[in-house]
């Protein structure tokens, strides 16, 4: 064994061994319990960063731990490879997105391999591979046939910098989630997936996901946003139609005094009288340019315009002026709000500003509200007033009664509404999966026949950064023949949102080379669902919601038998340096390559796992990295020093051990127990590593390492350290295991079990309190009888002075921990 630890030599040796022997190749094996471990796959941006190192190290610990426990582990890796950055890089470097992407994949694959991550590289996939995206086109066509994919004109979020559409979930504080540019509203024909068909199931199944963080589930439930209420028809005064309203507050219907419409409402301009036409048109234009998030904010300055038209309150028969209001959104309910200013604060502020009538219909029991003196809306529970036959009822009861009344009278109906909107997947970019449809002047939208798939991205597109979608300018791609009528037609030039590719990749990993369809159902059933998924919480209502939706769709299409893709979810924290998330713009990035070159991959892994629990943010510390490196050197030196002595040691005979040797063995088995629990039950890798560090200290402090009767205990202790470290620092541990004389690798050795008898302390320390204050301590046997411990405590020399002249009222014993004496 070399005296000095040389990380590069150790890592090169064992990474070569694992690659040569395909050590982490997963095969279906019904005789073993499966475990599917997956981290969210990366975008091939060019280089891995410390966030990647941490995320993938966390996953690798779990994968290696499960293998050592005997599980059949699937741990794949791939690349979320379509997307705008590749196109932007092509413009900047005058190259092609494919070249940039595949070069980055090759480089980042090499980086990941240097970390010693236990991936089954035979299952590697990239979403830009034709062999991947062609099957996605097949899935699209099946969704189209089922009515789950459709095209329509609608107001969309438009990023002027990326020159593409964004889904609602991709707009953050009014800006593009990718480039941070202000988002505009634009009317476009676009393709969408009918995720709303699955809204109720997506909501219901969140209550089955017991292995997910509650925070993520709450975010999804809020995004889906189920609300129950009524749809109510308000006839136009002109008699030429009606306005349909969804409300959850039908109990306030008698207090509705005006109507508010979203600027995007299809009737908005039609309702404008000749005198109001110009003002209404200008208002519509202004509001459409305003960010939706700002329009929904409580502190928004309320603005509106009178259309010149009126509708009729169907229960009071009073005229209600119809306004357009900047705070009403078209994507909630029907885009029309019955305004009840006395019982809704936004309506109250609007009514005060535009001098609109107020009518109280709910008031506190025993009190009378005067609209003339109200300074804010009354939104609490109360008693119904000014509401006809419903007067005197509690408003909660009146909700149901009024809903029944509306249905009976044919004025409205009970209904359920969801905040969730269909997923717009059209993107006006080249580097994405082509949507497999053809636009024909005679036949309209025509699906590409399955026999003509795949629709392949042309490689001769030009990337100038101007003129929108490069794909639309490739005549050889866009010009085609209609498969129905045979006339010249135009191929769809929108590509799919990259979140489509990441919505089913975890299923494709089960059979990545399958050539007869998107998924091999038998293999999907063998591996799915993913047992542990790991990724950032920023994907709570993007990727994680879409992946759940897609899994349910593929189930209904017959491709799989699972309802939910991920049984357990871990959302890891960020890597922080100098008080901020690492980023190039902040100049606080640590290059993993430089770190690995100086300290080795295992030090990088150890620090990222030891510095904080996985779900918490990790504060970068150069001293912490040094400390991790020093610890590995200490363990290496320990093995080097004891190896000549323990080389031929046999099994431990607990009955022949002296007191100090028993103490060391107890520490060994307590550590095995703690590390096992910390890794398996809590993923508290930091405390697990700390426990191993304490064990190393105990071994080094054991003075009789050389004594013949102790060599077996020392060998057991040292080997336990190596086995416990194996998931965290695999290259390092594998080499020490080899040096300890083992012919097989650590996975074959398995995870160590602990001796239950060995972890029992021969003595425990019991503290003694008098009237709640610590006064002394006792050392007793762990199974000591209560009477004996109480007697010892009362007879303790340090306790006696506190008892003299006092009446002992109570003595309470908490076994193995505490004696509490109460005196007066």
Curated annotation (Swiss-Prot):
Cellular localisation: Cytoplasm
UniProt motif 'KMSKS' region: location: 581-585
Pfam families xrefs: Anticodon_1, tRNA-synt_1, tRNA-synt_1_2, tRNA-synt_1g
Main location group: cytoplasm
GO terms under biological process: leucyl-tRNA aminoacylation
EC code(s) of this entry: 6.1.1.4
Binding of ATP, residues: 584
GO cellular component: cytosol
Record GO terms (molecular function): aminoacyl-tRNA deacylase activity; ATP binding; leucine-tRNA ligase activity
Keyword annotations from UniProtKB, A to Z: Aminoacyl-tRNA synthetase, ATP-binding, Cytoplasm, Ligase, Nucleotide-binding, Protein biosynthesis
Catalytic reaction list: tRNA(Leu) + L-leucine + ATP = L-leucyl-tRNA(Leu) + AMP + diphosphate
Motif ('HIGH' region): 42-52
Gene3D superfamilies according to UniProt: 3.10.20.590, HUPs (3.40.50.620), Isoleucyl-tRNA Synthetase, Domain 1 (1.10.730.10)
Family in the record: Belongs to the class-I aminoacyl-tRNA synthetase family.
UniProt cross-references to PANTHER family, sorted A to Z: LEUCINE--TRNA LIGASE, MITOCHONDRIAL (PTHR43740:SF2), LEUCYL-TRNA SYNTHETASE (PTHR43740)
Protein name, per record: Leucine--tRNA ligase
Source organism per UniProt: Citrifermentans bemidjiense (strain ATCC BAA-1014 / DSM 16622 / JCM 12645 / Bem) (Geobacter bemidjiensis)
């Amino acid at each position: 064994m070399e005296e000095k630890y040389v990380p590069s030599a150790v890592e090169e040796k064992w990474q070569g061994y694992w690659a040569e022997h395909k050590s982490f190749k997963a095969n279906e094996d019904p005789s073993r319990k499966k475990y599917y471990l997956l981290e969210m796959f990366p975008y091939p941006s060019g280089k891995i960063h410390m966030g990647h190192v941490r995320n993938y190290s966390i996953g690798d610990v779990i994968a290696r731990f499960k293998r050592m426990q005997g599980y059949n582990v699937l741990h794949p890796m791939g690349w979320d490879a379509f997307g705008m950055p590749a196109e932007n890089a092509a413009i900047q470097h005058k190259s092609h997105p494919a070249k940039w992407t595949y070069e980055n994949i090759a480089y980042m694959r090499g980086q990941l391999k240097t970390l010693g991550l236990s991936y089954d590289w035979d299952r590697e996939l990239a979403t830009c591979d034709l062999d991947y995206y062609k099957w996605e086109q097949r899935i699209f066509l099946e969704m189209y046939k089922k009515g789950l994919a459709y095209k329509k004109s609608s107001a969309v979020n438009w990023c002027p910098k990326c020159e593409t559409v964004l889904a609602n979930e991709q707009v953050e504080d009014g800006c593009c989630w990718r480039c941070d540019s202000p988002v505009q509203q634009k009317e476009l024909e676009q393709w969408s997936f009918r995720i709303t068909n699955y809204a109720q199931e997506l909501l219901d199944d969140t209550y089955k996901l017991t292995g997910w963080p509650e925070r993520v589930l709450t975010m999804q439930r809020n995004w889906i946003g189920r609300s129950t209420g009524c749809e109510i028809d308000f006839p136009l005064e002109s008699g030429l139609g009606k306005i349909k309203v969804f409300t959850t507050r039908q109990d306030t219907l008698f207090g509705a005094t005006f109507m508010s419409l979203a600027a995007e409402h299809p009737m908005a301009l039609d309702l404008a009288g000749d005198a109001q036409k110009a003002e209404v048109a200008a208002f519509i234009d202004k509001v459409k340019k305003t960010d939706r998030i700002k329009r929904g904010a409580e502190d928004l300055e309320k603005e509106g315009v009178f259309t010149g038209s009126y509708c009729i309150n169907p229960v009071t028969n009073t005229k209600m002026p119809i306004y357009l209001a900047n705070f009403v959104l078209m994507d909630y309910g029907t885009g029309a709000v019955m305004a009840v200013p006395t019982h809704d604060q936004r309506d109250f502020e609007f009514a005060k500003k535009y001098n609109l009538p107020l009518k109280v219909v709910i008031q506190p029991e025993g009190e009378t509200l005067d609209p003339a003196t109200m300074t804010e809306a009354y939104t609490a529970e109360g008693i119904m007033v000014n509401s006809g036959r419903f007067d005197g009822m509690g408003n909660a009861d009146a909700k149901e009664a009024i809903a029944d009344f509306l249905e009976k009278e044919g004025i409205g109906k009970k209904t359920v509404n969801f905040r969730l909107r269909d997923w717009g997947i059209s993107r006006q970019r080249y580097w994405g999966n082509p949507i497999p449809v053809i636009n024909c002047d005679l036949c309209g939208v025509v699906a590409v026949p399955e026999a003509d798939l795949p629709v392949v991205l042309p490689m001769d597109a030009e990337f100038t950064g101007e003129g929108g979608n490069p794909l639309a300018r490739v005549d050889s791609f866009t010009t085609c023949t209609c498969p129905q009528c045979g006339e010249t037609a135009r191929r769809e030039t929108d590509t799919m949102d990259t979140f489509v590719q990441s919505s089913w990749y975890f299923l494709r990993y089960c059979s990545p080379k399958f050539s007869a369809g998107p998924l091999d159902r038998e293999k999907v059933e063998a591996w799915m669902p993913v047992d542990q998924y790991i990724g950032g919480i920023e994907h709570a209502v993007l990727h994680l919601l879409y992946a759940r939706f897609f899994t349910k769709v593929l189930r209904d299409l017959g491709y799989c038998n699972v309802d939910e893709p991920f049984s357990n979810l871990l959302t890891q924290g960020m890597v922080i340096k100098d008080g901020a998330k690492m980023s190039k713009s902040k100049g606080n990035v640590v290059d993993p390559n430089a770190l690995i070159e100086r300290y080795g991959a295992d030090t990088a892994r150890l620090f990222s796992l030891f510095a904080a629990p996985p779900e918490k943010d990790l504060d970068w510390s150069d001293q912490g990295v040094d400390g991790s490196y020093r610890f590995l050197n200490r363990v290496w030196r320990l093995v080097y020093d004891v190896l000549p002595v323990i080389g031929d040691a046999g099994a431990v005979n607990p009955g022949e051990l002296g007191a100090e040797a028993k103490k060391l063995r107890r520490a060994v088995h307590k550590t095995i127990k703690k590390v096992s629990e910390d890794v398996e039950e809590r993923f508290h890798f930091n405390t697990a590593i700390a426990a191993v560090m304490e064990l190393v200290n105990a071994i080094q402090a054991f003075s009789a390492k050389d004594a013949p009767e102790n060599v077996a205990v020392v060998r057991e202790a040292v080997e336990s350290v190596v086995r416990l470290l194996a998931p965290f620092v695999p290259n390092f541990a594998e080499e020490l295991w080899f040096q300890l004389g083992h012919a097989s690798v650590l996975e074959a050795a398995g995870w160590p079990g602990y001796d239950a008898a060995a972890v029992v302390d021969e003595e425990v320390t019991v503290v003694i309190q008098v009237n709640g204050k610590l006064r002394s301590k006792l050392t007793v046997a762990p199974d000591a009888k209560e009477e004996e411990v109480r007697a010892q405590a009362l007879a303790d020399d340090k306790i006696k002075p506190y008892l003299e002249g006092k009446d002992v009222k109570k003595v309470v014993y908490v076994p193995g921990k505490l004696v509490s004496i109460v005196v007066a």
